[in-house]
Amino acid sequence: MYAIIETGGKQFRVEEGAKIFVEKLVAEAGSEIVIDKVLMLGGGAFSVGAPYVEGAKVTAEVVEHGRGEKLIVFKKWRRNDSRKKQGHRQDFTALKIKAIQA
């Protein structure tokens, strides 16, 4: 069974036991969170929400918090000998999916 969930403005296809990296959540490492924004359930029983499936929830464990790889933003203005280099690292939360309940 799989589910499509929404968290942090993005959608993820998850199965039990999967590890996903989502936008940073306010939760302690090792704690459990419940995601009730389930857009679709698939597998044996197929159901699509409008916008969310009622009564469906996904339970996940917070594995760790971290920062992604550095992205380089480089801007250059021609004929001015002007340029700007800036780096960015996005915070993330790693989740391990424990259970999908329909």
Curated annotation (Swiss-Prot):
Nucleotide-binding keyword on record: no
Keyword ATP-binding: no
Keyword tags: Ribonucleoprotein, Ribosomal protein, RNA-binding, rRNA-binding
Domain of life: Bacteria
Any one Gene Ontology molecular-function term assigned to this protein's record: structural constituent of ribosome
GO cellular component, one term: ribosome
InterPro entries linked: bL21-like, bL21-like_sf, Ribosomal_bL21
Pfam families: Ribosomal_L21p (PF00829)
Gene Ontology terms describing biological process: translation
Functional note: This protein binds to 23S rRNA in the presence of protein L20.
Family: Belongs to the bacterial ribosomal protein bL21 family.
Oligomer status and interactors: Part of the 50S ribosomal subunit. Contacts protein L20.
Name by which UniProt lists this protein: Large ribosomal subunit protein bL21
Source organism (scientific name): Nitratidesulfovibrio vulgaris (strain DSM 19637 / Miyazaki F)
